[in-house]
Each structure stands twice: as C-alpha cells, then as structure tokens.
Amino acid sequence: MQSIDLYSYLYSLLGQIPEGMVTTYGDLAVALGDVKAARACGYMLSRNNDTENIPCYKVIMSDGSLGGYSLGIDEKIRRLRNDGIEINNGRIDLKRYRFNNFDSSYPLKRLQEEQEKIAGLAVYSDDYNEDKICAIDVSYKDEIGYSVMVSFENNEYDFKTFIKETRFPYIPGYLAYREFPYIKELGKNFDGTMIIDANGLLHPRRCGLATYVGVIMNKPSIGVAKSLLTGSIKNGYVYYNNMPLGYMINSRTIVSPGNRISLESSINFIRNLGKDHYPEILKIAHDRTVALRRNNII
C-alpha cells in the first residue's frame, strides 16, 4: 500500500512555476498523474495556509480566467501584476504566460499501477462469513475524517470509532487512498465480512475501495455504493467494458463484490440484509459518522 501526502506534493509543484508565469488546475492535475484530479487541486489550493511561500495565486482556469484565491480576487490580481503578468478583461493569455513543464513523478499514475496489481489479486469465489458482518463509513470536516465501524453478531451491534487527519482529497477512482487508513485501523481485528460504503469490482481499474480493502486485509468484502459513477445498466446488472461488474438493486443501492465473494453472492447477501433497500447496518454506520463529526462523541 502506498501512502502519499498529496497536499504537500501539489504545493511542491507550485515552486517550479517560474516568475512571470502561471499554470492551470488541469495542468497540475496532469502533473499529479490524472486530469480527473483538477477539481481536487482547486480544493487543496484553497486549503493552503502558507500564502507567502506557496504561490497558489499562480494557478488559473483553463480558459485564462483567474479563478478563486483564498485572500480574495483583488489580492490575486495584485500579485499576478507584480509578477509582470498582464490581465485583460479578467483573463490571462495562456499562450504567452502558461507553464506546464513540471518535473513530476506522477504519483497518481503510480497509484493506478498499484490498483491494477491489487485487482489481479482479488478472488471472486465464495469464502465469506454471513453470520458476522460489519459496515464502515467515514465522514469528513475539512481534512479530518470521522470513521465508524458497526459490527453485528449474535443479534447485537458493536461500535468502534477512529478520528484521523487525511492528506489525500477526494478524487474519483482513488477513494481507497483517502479512506483505507480508517478501515485498516477499525477492521484490523475483525474476522467476518466487511460491507464498505463504496464500489468494489465496479471500478475503471476493477479496484474500488471494497476490493482494495479486501485484498490488502485478506478479508471478504462487498461494496455498496449510493450512486452510479461508471458503467451502464442492463437488466439490473452494471456493465463496464461489456463485463457485468455490479448490480443495481435500486438507484441508491449498487452492489459489487470486493474480495472472496462472487457477484451473485454479493447481490443475495445485500438483498438479504436490506430487502431490496439500502442495508440498515450501513445506514447506522453513516448516521454514527455524522454524529461523530458533529459532536466528536457517540
């Protein structure tokens, strides 16, 4: 498992922008390794508290418009003009001022490679415990994650919580690198089937959070997502690249196997829990994370 402080890595890239030049959120995302990270780049820049040493003002939109800045647009304009950059009608000429030749190790590409390797290790034959289950969810306030594991055995619920800072923002396709540290801590001593509020096999690289968790922790796992992020529906099954990777029980309950369970068994498992509705144990986990985030107590 790779662990990356993506905030610090992004901020280090800004130091490469020459004086009198700017870059775009998309250029930074490409330097990280995936253009899908452009929105996350904007978020991470908005969280920068060291505005004197980390020049976030040098990042603009792909159409040359200025975008936002934590110290306000007037201060952004002042700093850009102090660097000798011309601004006309609220835009900068990217042909003249654009820098995108970053020296980068492309960390997100490395994570993609890791996901592909982990996907190859996932097992989709049945080897799971249906009598001992847990659900895990994480809720966030800024960079702090509030996580809860709800386990159910012998008709009794048990709860564990874990609070930790994250240095990896939400980027579609990379949820494992944001949430796995919480799941690892909460579930390290659990020996049943894990139900994860995310996808498993249903993922562009067949390695959603539930698969990542299941393989790394060597546990049976099932992903249950509340929205369809990829694929198309045919007779309830979710197809991606012409392969059935998941199943939509309803518009808010999309199931895919994570590890050590088949697609059909995953569907039956979740249906038995929720009677064609979103599983109650996941609802409890979600409500508890929200309460933990709001109050820091349960």
From Swiss-Prot:
Ranges for region Endonuclease V: 80-298
Cofactor(s) annotated in UniProt: Mg(2+)
Positions with a binding annotation for Mg(2+): 137, 197
E.C. numbers: 2.1.1.-, 3.1.21.7
Major location category of this protein: cytoplasm
Region (Probable methylated-DNA--protein-cysteine methyltransferase), start-end ranges: 1-79
Any one Gene Ontology BP term: methylation
Domain of life: Archaea
InterPro entries reported in the protein's UniProt record: Endonuclease-V (IPR007581), MethylDNA_cys_MeTrfase_DNA-bd (IPR014048), MethylDNA_cys_MeTrfase_DNAb (IPR036217), WH-like_DNA-bd_sf (IPR036388)
NCBIfam families: ogt (TIGR00589)
Protein family according to the UniProt entry: In the N-terminal section; belongs to the MGMT family.
The protein's role, per its UniProt record: DNA repair enzyme involved in the repair of deaminated bases. Selectively cleaves double-stranded DNA at the second phosphodiester bond 3' to a deoxyinosine leaving behind the intact lesion on the nicked DNA.
Name by which UniProt lists this protein: Bifunctional methyltransferase/endonuclease
